[in-house]
Amino acid sequence: GLKIQDVLLHQARLSPFIVCYKETLTPGTNTPNPAIYSEKSKPGFTIRVADKMYMRDDWPDTMLDRIAKSPLGAKNKYVYSDNDFILLGKIVEAISGLTLDQFAQKNFYNKIGMYSTGFNPRNRFQAECLVPTETDNYFRHQTVMGDVHDEGAAMFRGVSGHAGLFSNAYDLSLLYQMLLNGGELNGERYLKPETIKLFTSYNSDISRRGLGFDKPEMNPDKDSPVCGCVSYLSFGHTGFTGTLVWADPSKQLIYVFLS
């Protein structure tokens, strides 16, 4: 079996990702297969992946089955994997009895005051408040706006451990200020200081990673996600769509970059 620690460190031997969306397209035309997608939400087709594009409800289970049956990679190797965080999100749901978005909203975002943060922003904001993500000409064939960029996360109802979270710089600064404060913000405690220290410290013999967090590269021969001006106490995470959040306890500094 897989160890949670190895999954958090991206050294659980899972593949980086599995491209499931291509299986749902019509061969030759690369357009949505009408057996899998409907232009309207209806019984059996309620998973919205874009405008006028609702996926069959059984496909998330198919995707999880693909992950579960995928071959494992080499031992003692660091490979960043979307599948790691997809599984972690499912573990949170299984333990809490809540969907991942419900759990995060209830225990963190609402209490902290992160009112612009959450999954599926179309359900909470007017269209004029949303920024277009991309012009998708390979899967959804439209301008994607208010729907997650990642195809797999879209197929998981827009809620997944590896992608789908929308936010802004102010909200993210609140979250990371709570972490810098040792788990407390505005008189409310969310996490124990020792928990934050454990997760944001170097935890691997084969990579620079913390538990879930990225860290500065200590090996001068390897590329680092940050410049040399930040301390080894610092931690954060980058995002595929051009995002980065980083905190340095030694300088009490938070850096948020959302492109």
Residue ranges of model-derived segments:
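Short, surface-exposed beta-strand/loop micro-motifs that present aromatic residues
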Residues: S234, T241-I254
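Short, surface-exposed loop or secondary-structure junction motifs
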Residues: L2-L233
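Short acidic/glycine-enriched loop/turn segments that link adjacent beta-strands
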Residues: S207, G239-T241
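Short beta-strand segments enriched in hydrophobic/aromatic residues
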Residues: V92, L179, P249, L258-S259
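Structural recognition of the beta-strand scaffold that forms the well-ordered cores
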Residues: D6-L9, G118, V245-W246, I254-L258
